[in-house]
Every structure is written in C-alpha cells, then in structure tokens.
C-alpha cells in the first residue's frame, strides 16, 4: 500500500513539475526528473526510494544557471525538511538529530562513511549552487545526489539509529544523574545542612539576632528542611539523615 501511495505521489509530482516548469523545458523529461528529485526531498522525504532516485538522476549536466537553481532548490528542500521536523516535533527533534549524529560517528566505520557522504552531499550542493559548478566533476555531483538518495532509502534505518541513540543517551544521562549529579547535590545539601545552624549560632552570639528571632529562624529552617527532605525522598531518592 505504501509503495502504491509512493508511486501515485511520484506521478503527481511529475504532473506538478510539468505545470510549474512548462515554460522552461516542458519536453525535457530529464529536467522534469531533476525537479522530481528536489520536490520529493523537500516535501516527502519519507517516501524517497534510493534506487528510483538514482535512476532519475540525468546522465548529463544542463546549463550552469539551471544547475545552480536546482542545487538551490535542493538546499531549500533540506531546510524545509528540518523546519517541518522542528514545527512537528518541537526542539526535541534537534536533540534527536544530534544524538543520531553522535551515534553515527561512534557506532562503526560504516556509519561514519554514510555520515560523511551525507555531509559531502550538502557541501557539494552548496558549492555548486553558490560558487563555480565548472569546478565540480560529474562523478562528484553524482556521489552527492547519491548521498541524498541514500538518506531517503535508509530513512527507516536512520529512525532506528535515532531511537537507539535516544535510549543510549537517556541511559547515559540517567547514569550520570544517579552518580555525579545526585552525589554533588547530596554533598552540597549536607554542607548547607550543617553550616546554616552554625551560621545562626554565630549571629546569636554576636548579638545580630535576638533569642526570639533565632528560635523563629530555627523553626523556619527546620520546616524548610523537612519539606526539602520530603521532596528529595519522593523525587530524587536522596537518603534522609
């Protein structure tokens, strides 16, 4: 069913690209395939199929102006995809992507190669779009678009890595919180707990506060301490004394 939907969407994009690019090169089917590639990346990255996209890449490069424009469209498509993800999932989406990048760079050499291809794809697109496309060999450009196609073909694998990275990150954060953070809070709490009564004793001895004020401060301190300990027991599981 998903394959049928993807095929229908592909045909729809072809029709749309004919309409919006008809005045430019309506009879140039290869150019239409270029537009299809960028439209798919921009609006439906989850329906990309790496093999199909690679077959749609033209066998020759057209004019520099068209090439620049097409690369700009691709970059805009990538940006739209990121913006759409942020709007849909909030800024937590950015953290998931960062976790994914870290995971990609640390899991294995294969993942590092894939990650490098994706980065190279964006770099080559930007170079061709804003600098001199004549300096780029066709094989390099093909590799760049192949990286984007790989991104589309491996979207499920990427989602798996993102989920796995989230789980690993959560586990690492939990471990760090359980050891470093809680121990620091515990030691800080002990220091404050022992220091504050001595501080009040000094104030009383120097006559800064009266006996009545001292008693009121001790009561207030004891009340706050009890509330803190209760919250710690419920939320952070810090042991009582």
Swiss-Prot record:
Sorted UniProt keywords: Cell membrane, Membrane, Transmembrane, Transmembrane helix
Q: Name one GO cellular component term.
A: plasma membrane
The question of whether Cell membrane is a record keyword is answered with yes
Subcellular location(s) per record: Cell membrane
Membrane-crossing residues? 7-27, 37-57, 72-92, 110-130, 138-158
| Protein topology in the membrane | Multi-pass membrane protein
Q: Which residues form a coiled coil?
A: none
> What name is this protein filed under?
Uncharacterized protein MJ0998
Which organism's genome codes for this protein?
Methanocaldococcus jannaschii (strain ATCC 43067 / DSM 2661 / JAL-1 / JCM 10045 / NBRC 100440)
